[in-house]
């Protein structure tokens, strides 16, 4: 069929819609009605359906979303995405200024930006076209989330002609307060779990398998930096360039000539905090001069030229309606405050942490009290105090129950006199929590097995222990309300995938007391296979760096239990293959480094930790077994000895290239 439109008309329509999007989502100035915009978009979609070969990567239709693949490939960042150190007091802030001035020899200009509580991303453009977007991930590698990032209406899909040929921008993806409330209202309507806060909602949206669904949620982006060959010597000027190229930046960045100006601006911004459309938890302070940033360098974890000044947590007043008891995966009873709902830091709070019985007693918290609630780190609500003037008459001090609220078995008090534990191995609460942990994020990461599904399967008698996960059948899942053929297939596929379990994740999933992801990784790197971990002696466990006596004793006791051995053997018989740990190829692997002198871009302890993380060893003295000597300023006698032994000498930059080759 002959087309009613030419390719030139199609491209012109793309440009019109591109301009309409920019005016509405970046300048917040609608230039056409919603109806006219929709008519243009329908026209564009019709042309692209008739001429798919005309479709360009920057077409506004790309924002409408499509289904993405079931996994998000992991890609190395062009430059590490490090975190920013936090400061909570003026004293910590002044320490930062002093360190900067001491290193540079002068007081620099600073740029201030809003610290938006969102998800950090890196977005890459080539020849002016958006080609890839990555999550922050571990700072070295991130997940490819390009399809969902394209749905952000304020983000340009193509850049003006004066933009660099290759450009990477970094920014924060977030939700406005109003949008977040709408999303949670939709979750309640659909009888789905609400998001705890806007940051969690943004993270969950970026991981949606349907970009079309992501597009409906109206994500926002605020750019905070760029990487290109055309960057100027001023960070502030680079931000203004980004703005000129069409990138959104929420809250005008401020340039401060003096420390006094910085402190004044921090106070002014805090006063405007409640008026902002999104959540911020502080202000990021950056040395403005790019060359000065390079001179200040970085540590293994964060940049030395930037600091996040965090405001005091927001506080709300509400009524403590009840104190509930949660039973964790290890049987520990934890008191939780049930509150009259109150809005705090961008989310509705109805429960809060009370930590333990000792903390409740220390603060004299009673049911019926008017309490003060804060968000620790702006995430986890906690009860921080009581308004005694409003205490009702007749309230009684709260005491921990003597029996488990779930199985009614007697509880025992741990030797630390703080932890209270249900020791009944058949307690359903502990069993369900243990299974939830086993399949959750950071463990085996089995998709589609949430709390409600696990509880239902437990109640049906399908699962009682973690190993039962690998016996689940199609018939079992069809008993769960709401599960259809497609859902069943997704769960079974995830379970099958989880059978190929990396050693460190498998150890972490077991839920051994005091063993998290870091300790599990250390065990995997040391022992390399599951059999060796299970047979490790107490002395061998204690010899591993970062594992103390208490953790070592917990690991040994866990693997000496007959129930543990039988459950792991059952998993193996059901097809679970615990993959041996393979150290990544690295020029550090197995090499011994010795450090002498003062390093500028990281502390000695940070350098040593980075070497060990890459599979290297750190020696205290130079010998024939030393592979490299790292030399900083004012090296000692080790430098001379290394020269005599003809040991390779590295400066700090050489070391950084080995540690971070990408």
Swiss-Prot record:
| Sequence positions that bind Zn(2+) | 404, 407, 422, 427
For NAD(+), which residues are the binding ones?
34-38, 83-84, 113, 136, 172, 286, 310
The Gene Ontology biological process terms listed for this entry are: DNA repair; DNA replication
Give the reactions, separated by semicolons, that this protein catalyses: NAD(+) + (deoxyribonucleotide)n-3'-hydroxyl + 5'-phospho-(deoxyribonucleotide)m = (deoxyribonucleotide)n+m + AMP + beta-nicotinamide D-nucleotide
- According to the UniProt entry, where is the signal peptide? none
SUPFAM superfamilies assigned to the protein according to its UniProt record, in alphabetical order: BRCT domain (SSF52113), DNA ligase/mRNA capping enzyme, catalytic domain (SSF56091), Nucleic acid-binding proteins (SSF50249), RuvA domain 2-like (SSF47781)
Cross-referenced Pfam families, in alphabetical order?
Answer: BRCT, DNA_ligase_aden, DNA_ligase_OB, DNA_ligase_ZBD, HHH_2
What's the name of the protein? DNA ligase
Species this chain originates from: Chlamydia caviae (strain ATCC VR-813 / DSM 19441 / 03DC25 / GPIC) (Chlamydophila caviae)
């Amino acid at each position: 069929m002959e087309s009613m439109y030419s390719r030139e008309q199609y491209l012109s329509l793309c440009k019109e819609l591109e301009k309409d999007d920019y005016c509405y989502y970046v300048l917040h100035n609608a230039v056409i009605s919603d109806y006219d915009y929709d008519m243009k978009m329908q026209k564009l979609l019709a042309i692209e359906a008739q001429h798919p070969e005309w479709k360009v990567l920057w077409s506004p239709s790309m924002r409408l979303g499509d289904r993405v693949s079931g996994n998000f490939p992991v890609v190395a960042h062009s430059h590490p995405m490090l975190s920013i150190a936090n400061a909570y007091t003026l004293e910590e802030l002044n320490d930062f200024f002093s360190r900067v001035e001491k290193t540079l020899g002068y007081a620099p200009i600073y740029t201030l930006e809003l610290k938006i509580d969102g998800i950090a991303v890196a977005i890459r453009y080539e020849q002016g076209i958006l080609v890839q977007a990555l999550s922050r991930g571990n700072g070295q590698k991130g997940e490819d989330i390009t399809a969902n990032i394209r749905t952000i209406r304020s983000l340009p899909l193509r850049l003006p002609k004066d933009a660099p040929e290759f450009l990477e921008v970094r920014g924060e993806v977030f939700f406005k307060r109003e949008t977040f409330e709408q999303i949670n209202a939709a979750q309640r309507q659909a009888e789905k779990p609400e998001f705890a806060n806007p940051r969690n909602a943004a993270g969950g949206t970026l991981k949606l398998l349907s970009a079309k669904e992501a597009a409906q949620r109206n994500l926002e982006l605020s750019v905070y930096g760029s990487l290109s060959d055309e960057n100027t010597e001023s960070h502030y000027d680079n931000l203004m360039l980004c703005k000129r190229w069409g990138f959104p930046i929420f809250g005008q960045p401020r340039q401060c000539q003096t420390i006094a100006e910085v402190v004044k601006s921090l106070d002014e911004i805090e006063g405007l905090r409640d008026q902002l459309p999104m959540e911020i938890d502080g202000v990021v302070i950056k040395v403005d001069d790019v060359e000065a940033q390079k001179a200040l360098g970085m540590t293994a974890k964060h940049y030395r030229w930037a600091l996040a000044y965090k405001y005091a947590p927001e506080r709300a007043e509400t009524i403590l309606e009840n104190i509930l008891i949660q039973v964790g995966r290890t049987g520990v009873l934890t008191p939780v405050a049930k509150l009259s709902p109150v809005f705090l830091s961008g989310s509705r709070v109805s429960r809060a942490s009370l930590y333990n019985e000792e903390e409740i007693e220390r603060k004299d918290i009673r049911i019926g009290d008017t309490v003060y609630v804060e968000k620790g780190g702006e995430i986890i609500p906690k009860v921080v105090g009581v308004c005694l003037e409003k205490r009702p008459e007749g309230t009684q001090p709260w005491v921990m129950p003597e029996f488990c609220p779930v199985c009614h078995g007697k509880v025992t008090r741990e030797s630390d006199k703080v932890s209270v534990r249900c020791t009944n191995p058949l307690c359903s609460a502990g069993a369900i929590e243990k299974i939830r942990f086993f399949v959750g994020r950071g463990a085996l990461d089995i998709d589609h097995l949430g709390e409600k599904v696990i509880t239902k399967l437990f109640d049906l008698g399908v699962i009682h222990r973690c190993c039962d996960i690998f016996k689940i059948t199609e018939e079992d899942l069809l008993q769960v309300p709401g599960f259809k053929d497609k859902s069943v297939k997704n769960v079974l596929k995830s379970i099958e995938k989880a059978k190929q379990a990396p050693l460190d994740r498998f150890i972490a999933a077991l839920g051994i007391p005091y063993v998290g992801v870091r300790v599990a990784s250390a065990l995997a790197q040391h022992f390399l296979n599951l059999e060796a971990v299970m047979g490790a002696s107490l002395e061998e466990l204690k010899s591993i760096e970062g594992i103390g006596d208490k953790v070592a004793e917990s690991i040994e006791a866990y693997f000496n239990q007959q129930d543990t051995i039988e459950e792991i053997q059952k998993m193996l018989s059901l097809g679970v293959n615990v993959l041996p740990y393979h150290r990544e190829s690295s020029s550090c692997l197995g090499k011994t480094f010795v450090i002498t002198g003062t390093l500028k871009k990281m502390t000695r302890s940070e350098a040593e930790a980075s070497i060990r993380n890459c599979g290297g060893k750190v020696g205290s003295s130079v010998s024939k077994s030393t592979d490299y000597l790292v030399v900083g300023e004012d090296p000692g006698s080790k430098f001379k000895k290394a020269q005599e032994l003809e040991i390779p000498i590295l400066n700090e930059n050489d070391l950084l290239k080995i540690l971070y080759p990408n």
